[in-house]
Amino acid sequence: MESTAIVPKGPVVGSEDMEKAEVIASGSTDIISTTSTATTTAAIGSVQEESVKQEDVPMEGGEGEVEEEEGETRCICGELDTPDDSGFFIQCEQCSSWQHGYCVSITQDNAPDKYWCEQCRPELHQLFTTDTGEARSIYKPVQEKRRQSRRKARSAAASKSHAANEAEKSPRNTSNTDDNVDDIGDEEDEVEDEASAVALAKDGNTRSSRRRRRNSMDDASTDQYSLDPGDSDKKLLDRKRATFMAREEKQYQRMLEKALKESRRTSHQEDPESYENDADIYQGDTDNHNGTTRLQTDVMLTEGKPDSVTNDDMKESLRPSKEQSMEKTNDVEKEASQEKESSTGSAQDTEKTDEPILPLTSISSSEDDSRKASSRGSKRVSKPARKGNRTRRSNTSSDTNQNRRSADIGTDKPVKPRLPPQRTSLNEMRRRVSAILEFISRTQWELSEDQSDREEFVRFVENQHFVEKVDTIYNGYNESLSMMDDLTRELLLWEKKYSNNTNAIQ
């Protein structure tokens, strides 16, 4: 508080007057300070009273809210207990009534902050009834939240898949040149592996050439990245064309081989002699390659021996091979004759067994002819093995057929009826009745046909005992027919009754 001095308006007379004026000013300041302190204390007291009043008011409101929260349970279903085991309730903001969360399609996980019942805010509810006649509701704000979350999840999944596809495409484009180079190298490796079977001594050279070519390819790929973008694109196109042409060439060679094999098979069916000659010519190269490799090994083993010894060894080594080839051809001829005698299968088997088998007229002293004969024998020996497999298959199929026949339901065994469930609709029952009526009509027709054959059974029979047995059988037929008639009558009455009722209801 600032003290204010009171200055007299009149003229100053003397020191006494000045002293009186100072005393008056000090007294006035004391009065002003006392009044200001009184006013401040009064203001503080009023503020405290107002704060106390404001604190008392929300307490009363809180008690009112507690009282309002204790509302009654008034659900759409009309029941007090929850229909599910969760026990989740939700309260209306306006009327404070409690409702089952299950009945309004709200769970504890997706419960909203504020909820209004169907009476206070009917536009937020979509009412419906279940199959059992129970009233239910769908709270629309919660449904909208679910839809939005589903849409977000779908969009996120779609964006992730799109990003993954783009990420896969980008490294493929960058590594395309390396893949093309590897494809060229792999195709060249296959061609060189086929050619390497000619001689064992050339394997090291082919491998070294392969490595050199691979290294040159890698150098070319590294140089490609160091060049300008235009040159790299051109080289990339050239690589693609080269790999495409190589693949086309490989595919063309495979197709040619398949066509040659098919033509040999057809020519074998028409002219077996020419087929054998072609097979000999076709296998000549591979046999010569194998023969050269074996002869090289024999020469390496017998380099230190004299010529006479080597000739004797060669003769002795060729004699058992000739004898083996003769024995194989004899065995093949015996098996072929046995196959012709025991051929009672299908037409394909007979055609294969009736094929002419040419005996070997002349056997040369070289290893190639013995190898050819052994290969022919192995090919011809495989035919009866196929027949044995077919006989096994036929035996297994006959066994399975016998098992199936034995597994059929017998007439003496009891059969359990298929009772309909309790919650079966009228349409389902009508369908069942029509199926039963159809079955009864078919069986009645079959039984009547069997009864008409009864006279043919007993026409030329004079033994009365046999006739009595036949009559007992057909008496059972009559009983079954009468039971079927009663059943059809009841089913027709049922169908007539309920079909009329359903038409009236519709």
Curated annotation (Swiss-Prot):
Places the protein is found: Nucleus
Polar residues: compositionally biased ranges: 394-404
UniProt-listed GO biological process terms: negative regulation of rDNA heterochromatin formation; negative regulation of silent mating-type cassette heterochromatin formation; nucleosome assembly; positive regulation of DNA-templated transcription; regulation of DNA-templated DNA replication initiation; regulation of transcription by RNA polymerase II
Biased composition (Acidic residues): 62-71, 179-195
Zn finger residue spans: PHD-type: 72-123
GO cellular component, one term: Rpd3L-Expanded complex
Quaternary structure and partners: Component of the RPD3C(L) complex composed of at least ASH1, CTI6, DEP1, PHO23, RPD3, RXT2, RXT3, SAP30, SDS3, SIN3, UME1 and UME6. Interacts with CYC8.
UniProt feature, compositional bias: Basic and acidic residues: 231-271, 312-342, 405-415
Region of interest (Disordered), ranges: 49-71, 138-425
SMART domains cross-referenced by the UniProt entry: PHD
Its biological purpose: Component of the RPD3C(L) histone deacetylase complex (HDAC). Responsible for the deacetylation of lysine residues on the N-terminal part of the core histones (H2A, H2B, H3 and H4). Histone deacetylation gives a tag for epigenetic repression and plays an important role in transcriptional regulation, cell cycle progression and developmental events. CTI6 links the SAGA coactivator to the CYC8-TUP1 corepressor. Involved in transcription regulation of heme-regulated genes and required for GCN5 recruitment, histone H3 acetylation and SPT15/TBP binding to promoters.
GO molecular function: methylated histone binding; zinc ion binding
Bias (Basic residues): 373-393
Name used for this protein in its record: Histone deacetylase complex subunit CTI6
